[in-house]
Design a protein with these regions (language model features):
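N-terminal alpha-helical membrane-insertion module
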Residues: 1-69
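An N-terminal amphipathic alpha-helical segment
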Residues: 56-74, 92-128
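Cytosolic juxtamembrane regulatory segments of multi-pass membrane proteins
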Residues: 71-88
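N-terminal low-complexity, charged segments
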Residues: 82, 108, 116, 136-137, ...
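Short low-complexity stretches enriched in small and charged residues
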Residues: 83-92, 127-132
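Short, surface-exposed ligand-recognition loops at beta-strand->loop->(often short) alpha-helix junctions
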Residues: 89-96, 136-142
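Cytosol-/stroma-facing membrane-proximal "stalk/adaptor" domains immediately downstream
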Residues: 122-180
Length: 180
């Protein structure tokens, strides 16, 4: 359902509708309607198709946005909030969410990069925390475990990362503030 409302889909549909209206108007000899709608419709349609071909949908959000709003606003760090905001939106022209971050951490494979499958918010001892599930791609699980200490520091001062092995090629990364 969320694929239906991506910006690429909306532009494609809008451009197609304008093009069809312009074509029908042209066929019925209504030049005042046909020219503008065709001239605007075709570029919008092509732009929508271009966006559609390069879009990366947001990962599944396992917890409703409203569920941890109060905890997020009171104890969430600005880095956690920025990370959440960054991954729950549509991306264009990238192979994976957090592409530049994973490249900087040397957790990237150009052919088959790690893919963020889902993100969840949770309460960790009264503190706001994020849990991300990655499909590892061709990056060995051992590389992730070697970088566990660096992961927390990379995403923000005072954050710690906890890694849990999931089933098959999945890895669960928890970013949280240490409990006092």
């Amino acid at each position: 359902m969320k694929d239906l409302f991506s910006p690429g889909s909306l532009l494609t549909v809008a451009g197609a509708v304008l093009t069809v209206i312009g074509s029908v108007a042209y066929a019925t000899d209504s030049p005042n309607v046909s020219l503008p709608t065709i001239f605007y419709g075709i570029p919008i349609f092509l732009g929508g198709l271009a966006l559609k071909s390069s879009e990366l949908p947001p990962p599944a959000r396992l917890t409703p946005a409203a569920q941890f709003r109060e905890l997020r606003e009171s104890t969430g760090t600005k880095e956690q909030l920025k990370l959440l905001k960054d991954v729950v939106r549509w991306r264009y022209g990238q192979k994976a969410h957090l592409e530049s971050s994973l490249e900087a951490l040397k957790l990237w494979d150009e052919e088959n990069p790690p893919q963020l499958q889902s993100i969840a918010e949770y309460d960790h001892g009264g503190r706001y925390a994020l849990e991300m599930v990655f499909d590892l791609g061709d990056v060995p699980r051992e590389h992730w475990h070697e970088k566990a200490d660096r992961l927390g520091r990379f995403f923000g001062p005072g954050l710690e990362a906890s890694l849990e092995d999931g089933e098959a090629d999945l890895l669960i990364v928890q970013l949280r503030q240490p409990c006092p």
